[in-house]
Structures are given as structure tokens and as C-alpha cells.
């Protein structure tokens, strides 16, 4: 069984750092505090701890800093906020004057670097009310044990919009992302060798150089400007256009399939059981979810009933095939197994909902998609005419426009670009003129849609000998990159270093003689070896997240941690792609 989340990965590292840097720093025996959070820190804390954890740290009430609140002048307040004008202004309103201040005193902890302008504003207004004011350098969300995001989905538009009027805003976004990435490295106690994918765009190069400079600044240890030596780790920075296929392909592993086909919002799955509407959060506290989320849907549909039969056969409570109704009856008969069984009911519902969508109109699509993506069929024979493979999908009235667009994109990606005439014909015949920018705008990510000349496709690792399901033959490109990085096979021209002193990377876990041994809480979470940290500009897919776990499992000497601006799903990505050539005032942003 998977270990509980408290023993696993990035989430526990982040929680322990917050515990040490914030709660231990302002702890006073027997004293309770009110905690104020903004939108970002609410997500951050929710990702790595529970309310019971906060109660243990002396937090009695949690409030939204943006909302009007009643004063509680006999209590001290702990502000855990982002160093933004909005959050700082909300803090200042709480301590506007001595007669109007809401709390007895304030402890302020910023997620990362607070600009001098904001710091001086605080200092000038209410310094006498402040007991602490610190920066703790955690400006990312630990989504999973090996996955992080910066929670900046709007960065996609600014990084890939062709509108020159967005250039200055793009620079601000890149600077902010670099600051956030440095906090990921700092939290992991890593000073990695920084590399980037040199093509097709220069975003990765620019961001990598910013990150390297900020790492140098962060790890300066004295006035002589000495830098902490590079640790046995690498940070790879990549533009989203490096693998367009994995973003639109229908995936049949459980987590990726569920988030693609079902309306799951904020990791919350809604379902019906026993005639009642219910909700379940898909999170790593659920050991069964951790166990099955990366498995193929066919395996999941076999495994969950098998687990149920183990329980039922032990108690001789049910006989025959395990169904949802049988599970409901079993919970009534054995209330002490209720929690265990209810999780299995959730995941069986989830799997069955996925399969219902799959059988309705996705099953036939998947074979076409795999053939187009790989250029070979299930028998390994080369596809001679991709258009003949695509046509049945375009003519099928049961497929909605989004699925047809995904298929057209896979056709174009598979042949590495088409002609303007052919693209116009496809758009007209499928009647997707209103959504044609979902196809054309991929060029802004450096993906060849209508290239001026035929380009060679990047070589892929031969995985023909690997055992796969026929409808799941595609392997995300990121897996090749992870494996090559660990085995020291990344081409230095294609993957330049921008570090002055790159780590010697051999994946063996060997540590340089210059590197001082460290004994701290991070060692509990770190494998006896190296770390590979990946950052993708513009979103990662659930299938790419899965690869981090698979490669870590296969290469015991290296832990792979993957992150991005945000996590994407195919439909949301296509909506974002469509908006790239729109002016900023026509685009809806997260904070507006």
C-alpha cells in the first residue's frame, strides 16, 4: 500500500517548512491566534495541511484577508500572505489607526520577496503593531507529492501571445515565475544546474537565465559574493510547444481520463449513489486513489471490485459479482468498514462514469488518435495516408467539434505541418470556422501548423518492445526527456546549460567531495541520490505528471519532480489557444 501523505514527498516538505518558518517562529505557549490568508496562501495551506494541523499550531480562526471582518482586539493575528499590493493594502486597512485596528498585534509572513515599496509602506503605517515581518520563500503549490504549480494560468497568454503590446507585461510575468521557481529549489534545498530546451522558442532560454541569476542571488552566503555550490540536481525548463500531442490526445489512464471526460472542478468529483448526490475530493490522503490513479482504466475496473471481494469474502458478507448496489448493502451490514468501502464506491463510480463516456463516443476515436500520433497502427505498420485515417472521425456526427479539432490537430502534428490550402479545406469541411484559431494559434507556441518548408520530426525513443494497451501506445515526450536527463544523454546543443558550475550528472547518487553533507528534515523525504526538477512554461498534462512517478520508480537513484504554471486539460487548453491572438481586453484573467 502507498504510504500516507504525511510520509510522502513535496507536500510534507512544504508543510514542515511552513511549520518551522511560521508557526514555530511565533509560537507562545497557551496563546491562540487568528490567521489571515489571501487567495494564494489559502490554496497553499489547503494543499499541504488540514484544519486539525492548524488547531495544533494554536490557530483558532482562519479568515479571508480580502473580506470585511469584525475586530477581535484581544487577539493577535498571523498574516500569511503574498507580497502583492492587494494583500498588503488589506493588511494596512486592519491597522489603519490605533483606535481602528482589528487585532492586538500582527505577525506577517510573506510567501516570497516583498518589494521595498510595499515593505516601506507597511513600515511607515503601522510598524508598532508588528511583532514579526518575514519572507519564507514558498511561492508555489505542492499539488501532489511530486508535482508543483505556480498557480499562474494567465502566464500562458502573456508568454505566447503574438501581440507586441504585451511585451512589458511578459517581462514582469517571467520575472515573477523565476522568483517562484527559485522558491521551489530553496524549499528542496537544491541549487541545481539549470538547463533549457533551445527550440522552438526562446521563452525557456530567457526564463532559465533569470532563474540562474536569482539562484545565485539567493545562495550568496557572505559579502564576498561566494555562491553555495551546485547540488546533485538538474532543473530543466521547457516551452509548452515541445510536445503538443500529449495535450490533446485522449488518455486512458485513470486520473488523466477522468479529468478530461468528467466535470471535475477543484479536484472535486460529484456522483450519485443510493439515489443521493455526493461529492468526493480526489487527493493523496486517499490511499486507494494514489494506488490506482496512474493505472489504465481497464486495470482499475478489474482492481477495485477485486479489493471489494477481498473484504466481502473475509466477512462472508456478499457473494457473486461486486456491483455498486452490492457495495452499498455491504456498508450497511459492516459499518466498521464504511470508510474503506465508501472510497471504493467513489472510485468505482468514477471508473464507470469514465467508461460510459468512453463507450458512448471515445472508443473509436482512440484508435484513430493513436495511429495519427504515432504514424503506425497497432501492428506496427506505417500509416501510409493519415488523411484516410482522419476522415471517418470528421464524418462521424456523434463526435462534437472539440473532439474533431483534437483529431485534426493530431493529424497536423503527426505530419509536422500542412499546407494553407489543406488546412482551409479541413476547417471548411468540418465546419469549425469559428474555432479555427484553436488550430492556427498553435504556431505561436512554435508548433509547425503551416510551416514555410517541411521540417524533420524529432526522433523518439523506440518503445515498441514495451507492453502497452492498443489504445494507449503513445508515450508523452517528457518521459524520453526525463530518462535521457537521468542517463546523461541530453544533447548539450539542444539542452544548453546556463549555469556557471553545472552539477556533474550521472544519476548514480554520487556526491561531489566539495559538497557538504546535510542533515535536516529534507533528508527524510529525499531518495538516496539526485533530483531532476522540471518546469514547463504553459501547463502540464496529467499524463506528464504520471511520467514523473513512473520514471522515479524505475530509476531509484533519482527523484523526478515536475511543475508548471498550471495543470491543463485538453478543452481548457484549446480555449486558451483560441484567445492567443485576441487583445488583452478580450481575455478573461484569473484575478479579474
UniProtKB/Swiss-Prot annotation:
One GO MF term: syntaxin binding
Tissue: Ubiquitously expressed in all tissues tested.
PTM (free text): Phosphorylated by PKC in platelets in response to thrombin stimulation; phosphorylation inhibits binding to STX4.
Key word Protease present: no
Gene3D superfamilies in the record: 1.25.40.60, 3.40.50.1910, 3.40.50.2060, Syntaxin Binding Protein 1, Chain A, domain 2
Major subcellular location class: cytoplasm
Protein location: Cytoplasm, Cytosol; Cell membrane
Keywords annotated in UniProt: Cell membrane, Cytoplasm, Membrane, Phosphoprotein, Protein transport, Transport
Keyword presence, Phosphoprotein: yes
GO annotation (BP), single: response to insulin
Similarity section: Belongs to the STXBP/unc-18/SEC1 family.
Quaternary structure annotation from Swiss-Prot or TrEMBL: Interacts with STX4. Interacts with DOC2B; the interaction is direct, occurs at the cell membrane, excludes interaction with STX4 and regulates glucose-stimulated insulin secretion.
Protein function: Together with STX4 and VAMP2, may play a role in insulin-dependent movement of GLUT4 and in docking/fusion of intracellular GLUT4-containing vesicles with the cell surface in adipocytes.
Record protein name field: Syntaxin-binding protein 3
Organism field: Mus musculus (Mouse)
